[in-house]
């Protein structure tokens, strides 16, 4: 099956990256192990067929993760985003652009998670931080949406360039927005907790 082949490829990639000093086994091995243990959850989200193209001649792909557990909600975006980013990066100068949109980003890009090991959390955040910091060079962009900006990695928040701010009520979130957006005036900050 394609998922098993993917896991095998991930193991080979891990071995290659560790031998080449490009990855730390402790960061990647937990991700692969979690992937192996969550095949059923992944099957709820994705249907794997031979020679399948994620885009299938479409410009937009929506992956709905509402029916899976929290761990899978973190794994699927990580795996897909990392794969697409690396494909784009390896193509060199590419005229096409990729915009990865992460809704409920505070669930995926958070330091606050206590359900996972530190190594896995570090790896997950490192992947998304690289995409948001380096992706523009390769035509890869990220759009994130969240009701809890204070829960998102500060490295990721610091790389954002455009903001649509709606109603925020939590003081930590208001402070995060105020600290992140240097050009936000006092009147605008005071209007955030509408």
Q: Which residue ranges define each predicted feature?
A:
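Conserved ATP-driven motor cores of ASCE-family P-loop NTPases powering translocation/secretion/packaging/pilus
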Residues: 124-194
């Amino acid at each position: 099956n394609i998922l098993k082949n993917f896991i095998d490829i991930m193991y080979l990639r891990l071995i290659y990256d560790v031998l080449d000093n490009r990855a730390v086994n402790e960061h990647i091995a937990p991700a692969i192990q979690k992937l192996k243990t969550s095949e059923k959850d992944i099957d709820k989200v994705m249907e794997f067929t031979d020679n399948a193209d994620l885009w299938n001649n479409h410009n937009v792909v929506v992956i709905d993760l509402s029916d899976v557990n929290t761990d899978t909600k973190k794994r699927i975006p990580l795996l897909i985003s990392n794969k697409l980013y690396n494909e784009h990066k390896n193509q060199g100068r590419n005229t096409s652009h990729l915009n990865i949109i992460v809704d409920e980003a505070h669930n995926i890009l958070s330091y606050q998670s206590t359900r996972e090991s530190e190594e896995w959390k570090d790896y997950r955040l490192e992947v998304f931080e690289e995409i948001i910091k380096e992706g523009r060079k390769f035509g890869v962009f990220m759009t994130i949406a969240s009701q809890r900006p204070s829960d998102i990695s500060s490295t990721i928040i610091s790389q954002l360039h455009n903001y649509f701010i709606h109603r925020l009520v939590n003081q930590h979130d208001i402070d995060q927005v105020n600290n992140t957006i240097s050009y936000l005036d006092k009147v605008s900050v005071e209007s955030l907790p509408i």
